[in-house]
Amino acid sequence: AIRSERTPWYFGPTVLEQMDAFVPVPSPENRPLRMPVQGVYKFTEGGDERRIVAGTLEAGSLRAGDKIVFYPSGKKTTVASLEVFSAPTPEKFIAGDAAGFTMTEQIFVRRGEIACLESEEAPFVGVRLRANVFWLGKEPLRPGKRYFFKCGTAKVEARLESILRVVDASELDSLERSEVQKNEVAEVILRLDRPTAFDTADSGCDG
């Protein structure tokens, strides 16, 4: 690529140089396993004591024999079998599949936890997080007020700790505001009532 003489003020990369620097985004199947737990179901008819963990794979893949960790609890187990309803059992589940599996150890897990492979990158677990939000509520978003924070299948009460900045959507300028009005974008700090597992937007782990 040849730099134009008409833009002597520009010292950044050319379009071709920038395109060559792009890194392909892994397909959801090739990212670390993320399966938010939708529910745990127990079947007792005919002496069937299996507990089936159900959910949808947001990313990654899952096979019988895989060692998994549930976050935020940190509980570990091994996948004993894959389970599907009224269909042949697949060799593996991949991102996008509605999945069910049984465990070798009957540990207690609940809706909202995230199943991950022990050998792969773990999600973040925390009670305080920085987030960019697009506010759609009728009432302004105000510090000190309590809200529900939803991530995957988890639903946790949270308090808005502070507003770092409000962004003017038309000019992209930062505004100093004490509250966030409807249809405004803001960067805020949230404090959750209990530890919750999540991935950051730039981690490459989300589905």
Question: What does each of the following model-derived ranges do?
Answer:
Residues 1-41:
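Canonical P-loop GTPase G-domain recognition
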